[in-house]
Design a protein with these regions (language model features):
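Bacterial N-terminal signal peptides that target proteins for export
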Residues: 1-9
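Bacterial N-terminal signal peptides
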Residues: 8-17
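Lipid interaction determinants
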Residues: 18-155
Length: 155
């Protein structure tokens, strides 16, 4: 065997080992890192599936956005401000969120707020998907899937 062949084989094996396991076109799945959650301009809900609550948060005219700080999360999109805490460890996240304002909203927006809180107040398998912009996919053990896209920092 030539030295060129011997050098090519380890490089090929390294390339195969570094290939992501996510579906085609989906990019690489990373463990959730608090720095990645915090260092964005927020996270916008792009899809929700898996039940009635997921349907309610996708109602027309409603766009949920979350922002993370160290251990705290805030969200809005229906009508009210939502605040709470979260923990992230490896590929798991857990939320404890409540509605903190009681605005006079239309029924569909109130339902969306309640449904969003209901969807988030649990533990999820969490995946940070590349390439940029990052996407955060939360999959509940009960089957609901929420996907958020990171927004650029605004100065």
């Amino acid at each position: 065997m030539s030295s060129r062949t011997l050098l090519s084989l380890p490089l090929l094996l390294l390339a195969v080992a570094c290939t992501g396991t996510a579906g085609a076109g989906e990019g690489r799945s990373l463990r959730v890192d608090r720095d990645e959650l915090v260092n964005t301009g927020g996270w916008t809900l792009t899809s929700a599936s898996g039940g009635e609550a997921a349907t309610a948060v996708r109602a027309p005219g409603i766009a949920f956005e979350m922002k993370f700080t160290r251990g705290e999360v805030s969200a809005n999109g229906g009508c009210n401000e939502l605040r709470g805490t979260y923990t992230a460890s490896g590929r798991r996240m857990q939320f404890d969120i409540a509605i903190t304002t009681r605005m006079s909203c239309t029924d569909d927006k109130n339902l969306a707020d309640r449904s969003f809180v209901e969807l988030l107040n649990r533990e999820f398998k969490a995946e940070l998907l590349e390439p940029m912009p990052y996407r955060l996919r939360l999959t509940a053990d009960t089957g609901e899937v929420l996907e958020f896209q990171s927004q650029p920092l605004r100065f």
